[in-house]
């Protein structure tokens, strides 16, 4: 059996949304539709006169369907076709399905059964048997041109003379439990984006990762009921629906009623990048499930940036800016331009140097896969993000020593020249508890990666940002030292003083670089652990006329270092 898909190179890339996707919204309306013309009434009435026997009995009695009948029997689907559930069966004739191919399908089915493959994943059931059967009756007339849902969830176009582009030979053979059609061809099976990654030998690393989180949930509405025994319905065909928690985050690339593009790295690129990304998610030994967290987070860091919802991107073709499913509507920016990124957002994706350059395009049932032998999405565009930690937010204040507690919060009013030059126009004022001490405050820095070089800035604010009449003493610069505390691999806290004593500039918003390309041995991403940053005033008693012991801090910028 052949799996059909279309491949184009980047230069000749084109998209043709076939009728399978275009007509998806009409599927439900098709089921159980009633007559609307005299011709249709006559046709349906004629079919009704033949309603004797089951679909399975009709298959057995038709000498032109022997090979399809053998495959159905070998896969135990004769029980389904002789049951009470109403079905439409589109059976390929022996001219369309030869004896050798039928034998091959039976052998493949039996091999997968022996290997413990679930029926939901059995390729013969999913891609062949269920691809030729639909729930409910779907009689055709001269007016027919609709899309129906097959038992595998695929949408297939049914016209008066074709199904999935293959010619109908006999139509509307009404039986006691449905309808039989004979087809001069096999209905093409088009994989969706998720399925294709498992069928392409160069992409199966992506599939193997995603499929680890597959769960199947029983769906009674799609299952074929049998007898009721001891008050419980026994199902001839139990249909389960794929439920993967990762899809709720990155996009439902497995759904036929959705449209997605996926930039998928080949196995060689996958291996190269996951080897690198694993180093960014090393958790200390105190973190539960640290190995599984490292595995999942490093691979989600790779997969998450390359999936795109067609509806959110104006059809994608010709678009200037492409947003992945993880893109945020907000971008993190600052007045000093330390941070100015739109994460998971890519400019000119089809242009030279764009993320789709050099990729292969594969058109699928619910979108496209762009196969990337050179994965062009940078970690700095996705998970290696700059962040701002506000000193004014109490959840990031760890300990306060020799200072008034709680810290005083100051707001920059709209008439002040510093308005909108400070994140959220609010900052913390750290006032010594008496004139003879140097205050210190330790702040929490969340969600940092291991072995990722960071540039760390402290943003100091002048007194005139909230009081334009501040005295000369209040406007003095600050002098301070700083420490970082983090866990080593064994979960033991390690404290390190940052090099030097820092001084701020007066009467300006001063972003002081505390550390450049600083790397932590452990990761705190998605945990309750924090890196801790202590800011401690360092003004001697003889220096109080030159420096202020009161420190005003808006917060801290943590930016991945770029060489």
Where do the PLM segments sit?
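Sec-dependent bacterial lipoprotein signal peptides
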Residues: 1-36
């Amino acid at each position: 059996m052949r799996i059909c898909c279309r491949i184009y190179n980047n230069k000749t890339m084109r998209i043709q949304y076939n009728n399978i996707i275009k007509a998806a919204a009409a599927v439900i309306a098709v089921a159980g539709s009633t007559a609307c013309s005299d011709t249709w009434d006559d046709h349906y009435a004629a079919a009704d006169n033949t309603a004797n026997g089951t679909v399975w009995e009709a298959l057995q009695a038709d000498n032109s369907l022997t090979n399809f009948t053998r495959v159905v029997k070998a896969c135990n689907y004769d029980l389904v076709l002789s049951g009470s559930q109403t079905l439409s069966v589109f059976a390929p004739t022996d001219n369309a399905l030869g004896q050798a191919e039928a034998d091959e399908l039976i052998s493949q089915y039996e091999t997968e059964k022996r290997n413990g493959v679930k029926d939901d994943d059995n390729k013969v059931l999913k891609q062949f048997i269920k691809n030729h059967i639909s729930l409910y009756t779907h009689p055709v007339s001269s007016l027919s041109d609709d899309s129906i849902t097959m038992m595998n969830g695929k949408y297939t176009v049914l016209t008066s003379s074709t199904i999935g582009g293959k010619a109908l030979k006999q139509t509307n053979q009404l039986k006691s439990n449905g309808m039989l059609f004979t087809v001069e061809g096999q209905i093409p099976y088009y994989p969706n984006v998720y399925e294709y990654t498992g069928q392409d030998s160069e992409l199966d690393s992506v599939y193997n990762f995603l499929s680890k989180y597959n769960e199947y949930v029983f769906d009674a509405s799609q299952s074929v009921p049998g007898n009721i025994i001891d008050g419980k319905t026994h199902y001839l065909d139990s249909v389960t629906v794929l439920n993967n928690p990762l899809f709720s985050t990155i996009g439902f690339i497995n759904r036929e009623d959705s449209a997605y593009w996926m930039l998928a790295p080949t196995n060689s690129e996958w291996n190269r990048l996951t080897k690198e990304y694993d180093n960014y998610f090393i958790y200390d030994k105190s973190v539960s499930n640290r190995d599984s967290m490292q595995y999942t987070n490093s691979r989600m860091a790779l997969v998450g940036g390359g999936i795109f919802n067609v509806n959110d991107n104006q059809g994608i073709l010709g678009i200037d800016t492409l947003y992945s499913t993880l893109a945020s509507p907000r971008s993190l920016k600052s007045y000093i331009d330390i941070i100015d990124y739109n994460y998971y957002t890519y400019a000119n994706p089809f242009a030279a140097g764009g993320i789709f350059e050099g990729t292969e395009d594969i058109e699928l049932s619910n979108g496209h896969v762009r196969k990337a032998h050179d994965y062009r999405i940078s970690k700095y565009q996705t998970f290696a993000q700059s962040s701002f930690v506000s000193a004014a937010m109490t959840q990031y204040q760890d300990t306060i020593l020799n200072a008034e507690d709680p810290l005083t919060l100051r707001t920059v009013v709209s008439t002040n020249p510093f308005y909108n030059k400070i994140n959220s126009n609010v900052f913390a004022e750290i006032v010594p508890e008496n004139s003879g001490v140097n205050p210190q405050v330790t702040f929490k820095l969340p969600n940092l990666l291991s072995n990722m070089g960071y540039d760390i800035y402290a943003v100091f604010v002048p007194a005139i940002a909230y009081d334009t009449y501040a005295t000369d003493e209040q406007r003095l610069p600050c002098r301070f030292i700083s420490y970082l505390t983090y866990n080593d691999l064994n979960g033991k806290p390690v404290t390190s003083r940052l090099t030097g004593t820092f001084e701020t500039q007066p009467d300006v918003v001063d972003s002081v670089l505390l550390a450049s390309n600083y790397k932590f041995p452990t990761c705190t991403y998605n945990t309750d652990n924090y890196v801790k940053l202590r800011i401690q005033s360092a003004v001697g008693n003889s220096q109080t006329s030159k420096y202020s012991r009161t420190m005003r801090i808006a917060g801290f910028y943590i930016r991945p270092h770029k060489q």
